[in-house]
């Protein structure tokens, strides 16, 4: 074998190993990729039953019904379409009607979204980016909010007021190292 043919075989072998590694990475990731959809997209695209995705929107006013054993039924809307949701488990503390959420789960044959995870917003101005983008694309986005946080820092509690007097003195020393 000549030097040139050995070099070509080495390059081909490296390329094959790289292609195999890339294929394994992509196949491993395909099971963990979850797409985001708004209620309008679910209605328009006819999502096949059993497809796993994230559903984002606002909890429709008057739709929350709590059942036995932590079963909760509610509807998610983006003002164009509404999708009924069933969830079993503890809801986040910030979950309430009219607030933005993202639920992850599957759509059943009857068109009910069966969520296994529900994430709620974290303050009065937050909306999941995907939900905001979907509302903007539909022309239903409203900038700003009617409530604003006070801008006067003097109304905030002093930093030392929250410190308990029974704190472990060694904890501060360990955390400073």
From Swiss-Prot:
<dbReference type="GO" id="GO:0005886">
    <property type="term" value="C:plasma membrane"/>
</dbReference>
<feature type="topological domain" description="Periplasmic">
    <location>
        <begin position="29"/>
        <end position="177"/>
    </location>
</feature>
<keyword id="KW-0201">Cytochrome c-type biogenesis</keyword>
<feature type="binding site" description="axial binding residue">
    <location>
        <position position="126"/>
    </location>
    <ligand>
        <name>heme</name>
    </ligand>
</feature>
<feature type="transmembrane region" description="Helical; Signal-anchor for type II membrane protein">
    <location>
        <begin position="8"/>
        <end position="28"/>
    </location>
</feature>
<keyword id="KW-0812">Transmembrane</keyword>
<comment type="similarity">
    <text>Belongs to the CcmE/CycJ family.</text>
</comment>
<dbReference type="GO" id="GO:0046872">
    <property type="term" value="F:metal ion binding"/>
</dbReference>
<feature type="compositionally biased region" description="Basic and acidic residues">
    <location>
        <begin position="145"/>
        <end position="166"/>
    </location>
</feature>
<keyword id="KW-0997">Cell inner membrane</keyword>
<dbReference type="GO" id="GO:0020037">
    <property type="term" value="F:heme binding"/>
</dbReference>
<keyword id="KW-1133">Transmembrane helix</keyword>
<protein>
    <recommendedName>
        <fullName>Cytochrome c-type biogenesis protein CcmE</fullName>
    </recommendedName>
</protein>
<feature type="topological domain" description="Cytoplasmic">
    <location>
        <begin position="1"/>
        <end position="7"/>
    </location>
</feature>
<keyword id="KW-0349">Heme</keyword>
<feature type="binding site" description="covalent">
    <location>
        <position position="122"/>
    </location>
    <ligand>
        <name>heme</name>
    </ligand>
</feature>
<comment type="function">
    <text>Heme chaperone required for the biogenesis of c-type cytochromes. Transiently binds heme delivered by CcmC and transfers the heme to apo-cytochromes in a process facilitated by CcmF and CcmH.</text>
</comment>
<dbReference type="Pfam" id="PF03100">
    <property type="entry name" value="CcmE"/>
</dbReference>
<dbReference type="InterPro" id="IPR012340">
    <property type="entry name" value="NA-bd_OB-fold"/>
</dbReference>
<dbReference type="GO" id="GO:0017004">
    <property type="term" value="P:cytochrome complex assembly"/>
</dbReference>
<keyword id="KW-0735">Signal-anchor</keyword>
<dbReference type="InterPro" id="IPR004329">
    <property type="entry name" value="CcmE"/>
</dbReference>
<keyword id="KW-0408">Iron</keyword>
<keyword id="KW-0479">Metal-binding</keyword>
<dbReference type="InterPro" id="IPR036127">
    <property type="entry name" value="CcmE-like_sf"/>
</dbReference>
<feature type="region of interest" description="Disordered">
    <location>
        <begin position="133"/>
        <end position="177"/>
    </location>
</feature>
<keyword id="KW-1003">Cell membrane</keyword>
<keyword id="KW-0472">Membrane</keyword>
